[in-house]
A protein has these predicted regions:
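Beta1/beta-strand and adjacent pyrophosphate-binding region of the FAD-binding site
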Residues: 2-16
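Helix-loop-beta segment of a Rossmann-like dinucleotide-binding subdomain
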Residues: 69-77, 91-117, 145-147, 157-159, ...
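Glycine-rich FAD pyrophosphate-binding loop
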Residues: 9, 25-49
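Fold-independent oxyanion-binding glycine-rich loops
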Residues: 13-14, 35-37, 48-49, 56-57, ...
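Small-residue (primarily alanine) positions within well-ordered alpha-helices
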Residues: 13-16, 20-25
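Predominantly flavin-linked oxidoreductase catalytic cores and closely associated redox partners
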Residues: 46, 113-114, 118-172
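Glycine-rich active-site loop/strand segments that organize a redox cofactor
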Residues: 51-99
Length: 172
């Protein structure tokens, strides 16, 4: 597909980027997911001590409250995808979950790789395209659209979703 054909470009193939690309593609958008690393979901594999705590078993108010006043920004995201919907998403893709005493939700297998594999399988089925080893070096907005600049190409698109995360481990 040529760069001009993308309706949505998602930057960053961690948990948020994979979910965003899946949902955009499943809603009929021609979606490109760009990841600077050669492998997607690296932090997923490390989360929860390599078990991947998927979410926390409480209502949205509990999650927002855990972040204090700054947590108010979470309301809209949590309204779009509840804890129950998150659990259902993974269980529908063959990742049964369990709730531990702490309220953390983990895959029954205790393997973060199962979570990543489910996301990558769903991404492939969604029709989204994953481009690995292609960092976005600039995002421009000339007029009503965007241009994503990578070392390999210039990608015009009307919508960009930034899910680049943060540096939670050395070399991120």
């Amino acid at each position: 597909m040529t760069g001009a054909g993308w309706e949505v470009v998602v930057l960053g193939a961690g948990a948020a980027g994979l979910m965003a690309a899946i949902h955009a593609a499943e809603r009929g958008r021609r979606t490109l997911l760009l990841e600077k690393n050669r492998k997607p979901g690296v932090k997923i594999l490390m989360s929860g001590g390599t078990r991947c705590n998927i979410t926390h078993a409480c209502d949205n108010r509990g999650i927002v409250a855990a972040y204090g006043a700054p947590g108010k920004f979470l309301h809209s995201a949590l309204a779009a995808l509840s804890v129950q919907q998150t659990v259902a998403f993974f269980e529908a893709d063959g990742v049964p979950t369990k709730v531990e005493e702490t309220g953390k939700v983990f895959p029954v297998s205790n393997k973060a790789l199962d979570v990543l594999d489910a996301l990558l399988s769903r991404l492939q089925r969604s029709g989204a395209t994953l481009a690995l080893g292609e960092p976005a070096t600039d995002v421009r907005k000339p007029g009503d659209s965007f241009e994503i600049v990578t070392p390999q190409r210039l990608i015009p698109c009307p919508r960009v979703i930034l899910t680049t995360g943060g540096q939670s481990y050395p070399g991120a």
